[in-house]
């Protein structure tokens, strides 16, 4: 097995950032759960759904950055592998959201580079703080993402089966990642950290809906 140096991981991180931020460069490994479904929408419904999916796409960009940052600084090899595997699974979400945005004649958020940079930095700091905090950070992030997804599912037009199936599968995966992180030794984060994460998340969701 090849041993990766710090330089190797930095180069890999740069490549991962480009793949997360440049539309069309991420391919899903699993089939899109929205296949074989139809979702005719009015103009206003399509605009609203596009806003929701843009927020979800930005959330997945943040998740990618979080995992990439943690994988770069994680101390234990098994934790680094956990982060890398989770990032691979999250790539499906990124691709599915991007596909849905295309179907709605919309585009990802222009602010994604900002969200990626912030999340990468937070992930790297969490990794430096220690693996139990790094895993706890993952668990809390996935909990918040799941909460957003459940809220968006309630906001979807009742006949938008395509978006519904995508978000339901994403939510299932996020909860699995949360449980995996906790079972691997993740600890509950301090209240101040949770509040900060929530504030950043709210800023991202409000701006990415429009921009």
UniProtKB/Swiss-Prot annotation:
Which top-level group of life is the source organism from?
Answer: Bacteria
Q: In the record's cofactor note, how is the cofactor described as bound?
A: Binds 2 iron ions per subunit.
What name is this protein filed under? 3-demethoxyubiquinol 3-hydroxylase
Indicate where this protein is primarily found. Answer: membrane
Naming one, the record's GO cellular component terms include: plasma membrane
Binding of Fe cation 1: at which residues?
Answer: 60, 90, 93, 174
- Name of the gene encoding the protein in the UniProt record: coq7
Compartments where located:
Cell membrane
Q: Which organism is it from?
A: Acinetobacter baylyi (strain ATCC 33305 / BD413 / ADP1)
Q: Which GO terms describe its biological process?
A: ubiquinone biosynthetic process
């Amino acid at each position: 097995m090849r041993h990766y140096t710090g330089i190797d991981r930095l180069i890999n991180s740069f490549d991962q950032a480009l793949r997360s931020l440049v539309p069309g460069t991420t391919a899903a490994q699993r089939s899109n759960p929205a296949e074989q479904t139809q979702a005719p929408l009015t103009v206003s419904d399509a605009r609203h759904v596009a806003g929701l999916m843009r927020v979800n796409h930005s959330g997945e960009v943040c998740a990618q950055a979080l995992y990439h940052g943690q994988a770069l600084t994680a101390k234990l090899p098994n934790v680094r592998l956990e982060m890398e595997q989770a990032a691979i699974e999250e790539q499906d979400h990124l691709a599915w959201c991007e596909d849905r945005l295309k179907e709605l004649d919309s585009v990802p958020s222009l602010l994604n580079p900002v969200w990626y940079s912030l999340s990468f930095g937070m992930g790297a700091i969490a990794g430096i703080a220690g693996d139990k905090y790094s895993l706890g950070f993952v668990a809390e992030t996935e909990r918040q993402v799941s909460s957003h997804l459940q809220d968006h599912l309630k906001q979807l037009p009742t006949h938008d089966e395509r978006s519904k199936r995508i978000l339901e599968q994403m939510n299932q995966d996020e909860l699995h990642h949360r449980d995996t992180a906790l079972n691997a030794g993740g600890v509950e984060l301090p209240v101040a950290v949770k509040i900060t994460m929530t504030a950043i998340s709210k800023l991202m969701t409000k701006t990415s809906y429009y921009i």
